[in-house]
Amino acid sequence: MHFMTALRAAWRTRNSLLCVGLDPDPTRFPAHLHGQPDAIFRFCSEIVDATADLVCCFKPQIAYFAAQRAEDQLEALIAHIHARHPGTPVILDAKRGDIGSSAGQYAVEAFERFGADAITVNPYMGRDSVEPYLEYTDKGVILLCRTSNPGGSDLQFLDVGGGERLFERVARLVADEWNQSGNCSLVVGATFPNEIARVRELVGDLPLLVPGIGAQGGDIAATVEAGRSADRTGLMINSSRAILYAGADHDFAAAARRAALDTRDAINRHR
């Protein structure tokens, strides 16, 4: 699967800019899954099956799986998504950042072991730390730019010369120099719509992964208005907890579907 091709097809055929984040917390699972050895896979796969036709992509967060020694369940989950819902891109949210030789191994892990279609990457160490991911030209490389957390301003607003802030330099570098294979994207948080608009101005129609709506409080209308591309797509607007934990009983997947449908439709009202 070519990530960018699949993403654009999903925007069009599913009429959706919604990305569902898969951040499984076993303490919040329905009681009937407690103590089950494959609880993480069962929980996530039911969410996936209930919402796949409503999303443009899924985004499992690797830390939630690794903390529970459940990397094998992550591998099975991504395989399940590809088998049951062909054409649905999967972003491995790992935010990797290391020197080239280590980055190469992380790229193998993401794309060959787990079978992800894209990965989130920290660009702080520069181009050589990102190059091993870029070499997988059919895979998406989604680089942190203006993150949704409050502490993001500690570094991302630093002036790097000529009045240019660090997040702006990252956006410009990625769009103008690193995206030679057309497989780059950026992370820009929904909690900062002014910065979303600035990044969109700098990068043209480059896709943006936008976390921060739902539990983090980002405004959907402001996010869409600031971040949509000229063709009214260009966004992967992520919601995790507000969808995953919309219900807490046997009908949790149906509750997740209702929450995902409401979120997708709210996004579309502002396109």
Curated annotation (Swiss-Prot):
The keyword Lyase applies. GO terms for biological process: 'de novo' pyrimidine nucleobase biosynthetic process; 'de novo' UMP biosynthetic process. It is an enzyme of class 4 (lyase). Pfam families: OMPdecase. InterPro entries: Aldolase_TIM, OMPdecase_type-2, OMPdeCOase_dom, RibuloseP-bd_barrel. Its EC number is 4.1.1.23. Keywords: Decarboxylase, Lyase, Pyrimidine biosynthesis. Belongs to the OMP decarboxylase family. Type 2 subfamily. PANTHER family: OROTIDINE 5'-PHOSPHATE DECARBOXYLASE (PTHR43375:SF1). This is Orotidine 5'-phosphate decarboxylase. It comes from Aromatoleum aromaticum (strain DSM 19018 / LMG 30748 / EbN1).
